[in-house]
Amino acid sequence: MDTPEKSETQIGTPVSKLKVEDSPVFSYICNLSPIKTIKPIPITCPLSSLNYASPPSVFTSPHAVSHKESRFRSQKDVSASKEVGEEEALVGSEPEQSYKNDCNTPRVTNDVKDNGCGKDLQVMMDNVKKKSDTPDWETLIAATTELIYGSPRESEAFSCLLKKTSNSEARLRGSITATSVAVTNTDVVNNESESVDALSILHRGVRRRCLDFEVKGNNQQTLGESSSSCVVPSIGLHLNTIAMSSKDKNVANEYSFSGNIKVGVQSSLTPVLHSQHDIVRENESGKDSGQIIEVVPKSLASVDLTPISPKKKRRKSEQSGEGDSSCKRCNCKKSKCLKLYCECFAAGFYCIEPCSCINCFNKPIHKDVVLATRKQIESRNPLAFAPKVIRNSDSIIEVGEDASKTPASARHKRGCNCKKSNCLKKYCECYQGGVGCSINCRCEGCKNAFGRKDGSLFEQDEENETSGTPGTKKTQQNVELFKPAAPPSTPIPFRQPLAQLPISSNNRLLPPQSHFHHGAIGSSSSGIYNIRKPDMSLLSHSRIETITEDIDDMSENLIHSPITTLSPNSKRVSLSHLDSPESTPWRRNGGGRNLIRSFPTFPSLTPHH
């Protein structure tokens, strides 16, 4: 910093300056040189023009703004002229009254341009003088208070907030669980002047904080830009300015004690729903865009508010109308809907609107034609219009039919004729009707999920019918009696082709050991066999009923009968069939004929035979 030129008064009085330098006060100040004497400088820095922005137009009129700007410039000049006046007062060139006049009037600006700042020594003298010269500083602060908005008291600035919080507590005591800081339109109309006063007081307090923390022009907002009608509680320092800048978004904070909160951006003012009370709040500024937090009750949480398209409505109506008596929606092109492959005609219904057929005659208008065609088809096939699936609960299970599958009486009576689809396509009548294939079906490689047709089993039945051998339709379930310690038998495949067994003269089977690898286990020493489970191919020749009994019950009878055990463990035995019923007194009632051939007793070894 260059040394400013001295004024004429300073040049003209060098003797008085030397007296000041030789004074004991000057020597005392020189000894205190390590002490930083720039303490009052921060007080004068906020008085610069950079720290002051033009006040908002809502608080002042244009005349007041121009007046304050002129006072602001004069105060800057007064601070500079004060230093010059103090310097001249030390040398005794000017009386002290001229300095007081400079503080009150801006007419000393011409001297400031000529003089500027004094030397460092003179600045130190000024600091000492300023500490003792309190009346002048009081006048300076009194003059600048008009530029600085008065700092509000905390109770005054937040009176609106305290009043609103007390109201919200009263509403909570009244069992309303959702409260809001925002007010309704009626509250805005009644308390309009109160909210404006609170905002103006808060604005003055923020402007004062900007002086302390050097926030330059960040809070130039008008009353229309503010989004709330109540003072937002501050967090200290100059961060209130950040809290007040809401980026032109209207935020309505909803405090709720329930967990169902739905946050979304809405384009219009929407009511806030609650389970107990319906509280409707609208934004004060009236803008269309804004963020609104609304509390959705639990009863409305699971409601699907998405609009349903016309296509979905049409599908739902069609599905609701479908049933046994509804149209099948055929797509006939050339048959005029008078053939059996027309689903509507085959089911006995007329074609209606959902059908996409062309040149249709299956309508009430052509009733005579439809009836004539039906009679003609029934004359050729009486079961043409019969139901595809007939379910009868009183039916008897047919031969070789598994009870877990679909009963044969409920299967398709006409039968399918599938060749390559394995009865897994919808054009298979059995699969389409939801039933298994039956004997009447002529399908190949059947894999119907509702019930398969076993080709090997039914082919043997057909051969038996052609050979004239009577077949049985009922079988008695075999019963095997085991010891408690006997392990379960190993399951054997049931449906496998077997060789034709030889038949004796008395229509009894003579099965060799090699032919009983399925269902029979034999002993090579005696040739007596035990059939565990008869094969279905044996049922076509004769009725077979096997009887097995516990070894403990038959221990005495087994001594006189030719019985051979089947295994070393002696767990199963087979009884031979004797020619005379008297020789088997141990046989129980209801027992069937045995398949095993009886052998004569061994000759005695006595010499007289």
Swiss-Prot record:
GO cellular component assignments: nucleus
Keyword Membrane annotated: no
Alphabetical keyword list: Developmental protein, Metal-binding, Nucleus, Zinc
This protein's record includes keyword Kinase: no
Compositional bias ranges of the Basic and acidic residues kind: 69-84
Subcellular localization: Nucleus
Deleted gene: phenotype: No visible phenotype.
GO aspect biological process, one term: stomatal lineage progression
Annotated Polar residues bias: 466-477
Residue numbers spanned by region Disordered: 69-102, 307-328, 457-477, 569-609
Expression (tissue specificity): Ubiquitous but expressed mostly in flowers and at significant levels in leaves. Detected with highest levels in developing ovules and microspores, and in petals.
GO molecular function, one term: DNA-binding transcription factor activity
InterPro entries: CRC (IPR005172), Tesmin/TSO1-like_CXC (IPR033467), TSO1-like (IPR044522)
Superkingdom of origin: Eukaryota
Domain CRC, first and last residues per copy: 326-451
Domain remarks in the Swiss-Prot or TrEMBL record: The cysteine-rich domain CRC binds zinc in vitro.
Protein family: Belongs to the lin-54 family.
Function: Plays a role in development of both male and female reproductive tissues.
Protein name (database record): Protein tesmin/TSO1-like CXC 3
Lineage: Eukaryota, Viridiplantae, Streptophyta, Embryophyta, Tracheophyta
